[in-house]
Design a protein with these regions (language model features):
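Nucleotide/pyrophosphate-binding catalytic subdomain
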Residues: 1-89
């Protein structure tokens, strides 16, 4: 019998500070110790997407979708990297 799979998504407020990221990492680590397989999805930290969009629109009134997608994905990648670092403890 296969182990259950749990998918958890943490929004910007949930990963908005280092303390919150540590809390999320602790939750994930505790659940993982039970043997459950997990998929974790994180958003950019609270307010980061808006900041990035504002920067883009300062430079271009009609930014290309490709560049916007790449720019905005950096917020999620930062959150994912910080969470991965927190999970190493």
């Amino acid at each position: 019998m296969s182990k259950p799979l749990v998918v958890q998504k943490y929004g910007g407020t949930s990963v908005g500070t280092m303390e919150r990221i540590e809390y999320v990492a602790d939750r994930i680590a505790k659940l993982r110790k039970t043997g459950i397989n997990m998929v974790i999805v994180v958003s950019a930290m609270a307010g980061e997407t808006d900041k990035l969009l504002k920067m883009a629109r300062t430079l271009s009134k009609n930014p290309e979708r490709r560049e916007i997608d790449m720019l905005l994905s950096s917020g999620e990648r930062i959150s994912a990297a910080l969470l991965a670092l927190a999970l190493q403890n």
